[in-house]
Amino acid sequence: NGKIALLKGRSNYLCLHRLRQHGGSSTLLDRTTMVELSDVRRWATSTKSGDMGEMKSLAEDAKVLPFVTSTMDNCLGKDCPDYEDCYMIKARRKALDADLVVVNHHLFFADMALKDTGFGELIPEADVVIFDEAHQIPDIASEYFGESLSSRQLHDLSRDLELVYRTSLKDAKQLHTAGEKCKMTSADLRLLFPEQAQKGNWREMLTRDEVQTQISKLNDALNILYEVIKLHLSRDKDLDSIFERVSDARAKLARLTDAGQKGVSLW
C-alpha cells in the first residue's frame, strides 16, 4: 500500500512564467506556434498537474514547447515569481512523500549532475535504486558528466534574450544586435560540420584553419554579448539568468578549444 510517484524532467511541465512571458510577444512566433500557444493557454486554466503529456492534441515535437516549458539553463529557480505555483516543484513535493519514485535514466543522471540551479536536487534521496535497461547507462551518464556547447544552446539563448528585449527592455536594442550576432556566428560554425550529428576527434577538428577562424569569431561574439548584457544587469531577472548562461558558454568554449588539456577526452 506504499505511495508511488512518477517524476519527469522539467521540460515536461508547463512553466507559468514562460507562458506569461509570451502573452504579448506574438511577433516572435509564427502562425502555427501561435495556434498551439492558444491551445496551451486554454488547457492551462484547468490542468492540475501541468504535465504537458495531458495535451494529447499537442505533438511531442510541437514548436510551442520551448516557449512554455523551462530548461535547466533558463529556469529562474527560487527567483521565479511563480515558484510557489510551479508544477515541477509540486511534482517534487509529491515525490518526497512517496515510498517509490519512478524516473527515467536521463532525469536520474541530470539530477546527479545538478549544481547550484536554485532548485537543488529534484529526486528525493533513495535507499535503493533499480535500473531498467542498464546497458544504456554509460552513454547517458557521459552526456551529463561531460561538458558540451552546441549551436542549439546558443540559439535558445539568443531567443530568450530577444524575448527580454521585446517585452521588458525595449530601450536596449544592443541586446537584440549582440544576440543575433552570436546566433549567426554559431550557425556559421555549425555549417563547417556534417549535417547529421556524428562522433569524432575534436582535437583533429581544431587543426582546421576554417574551424579555428570561426571559433575565434564566436568567442568575440560571446565577449561582446557578455559586455552588452553586463550594462543592464539587475534590470530584469531573466536577463540576469541569461548573463550567467553567457558566462558559462564563454568558459566552456575556452575549455573545449584547449587541445592541450590532459586527462580529458574531446569529441
Model-derived regions, located:
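Generic alpha-helical secondary structure signal
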Residues: 31-38, 50-66, 89, 152, ...
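P-loop NTPase motor domains
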Residues: 48-57, 127, 255-263
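Short, charged low-complexity intrinsically disordered segments located at boundaries
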Residues: 18-27, 184-193, 213-220, 251-256
